[in-house]
Amino acid sequence: GDAVDDAFSDLLDNAGSMNDVLSDRSDIAIADLRAINDQLRVIIDLIRDAIDEERDKDLDDYFEDISDQDGDGKPDAGLISTCQNDGSVEGDVNVGGIAGSMAVEYDFDPEDDLTKVGDKSLDFRYLARAVMLDCVNRGEITGKKNYTGGVVGLMDLGRVSGCQGYGPVSSSDGDYVGGVAGASYGFIRDSWARCQLSGKDYVGGVAGYGSTIENSRSFIEIDKGEAYVGAIAGDMEEDGTLTGNLVGHDTLGGLDGISYTGKAQPTTFDELSALGNAPGEFTQ
């Protein structure tokens, strides 16, 4: 009997020891699971933050305008040069003698012309290049609504250099009318405008509204303009660049009716014509 009691006692003691071991291991496993759960929460929070950040982005955040760069070894990429228009152009919105708009088409790669650079990533950007060089408009440009320009109606991005606008530009019921561009959020340089302009608000000799306008010349007549009217630009972006432009107008100032030395400076038509780079057509 005593031997049986001793055997049961040993069995119970061993069972108790085993239970203690299992309990310790269970505590360790639970602690490990809790640590894993905490890390999962951290990862989920990071993913949620990344998703929220992407949701807060506009489409423009995915595009970088590289039109003012050298073309990354591809000088003809995104380039229009030495085009001329002598015909009348009519349209509703985004009307121009050479191009209606310089902008990004948001439909996903309709022509299979995207080039991928780098490894796969959720944080991606598109590089956009749109350059217009030495183009001339002589035709009459007529729009019904916003963004009517002698050379291009709307520049969401891009660069226009050495272009000339001679044909009359008008919008019957719209804003943003310009001898070169109706509105430009890109770069306009070394361009010339000698034409008649008519619109509602934001009417300018070079651009109705501009971001960067440099070393450009205008000798224009404005038949109609209500607010923000200038011989170079009707108005500019707050942090825009306006420099080296010349205005051949007796009474109208360069920017919203006011001239600025070194930026939108008044001069005479004879002085404009005497400039070494003045196009022959401009001086006639």
What are these regions (language model features)?
Residues 1-284:
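Predominantly extracellular beta-rich ligand-binding scaffolds that present long acidic/polar faces
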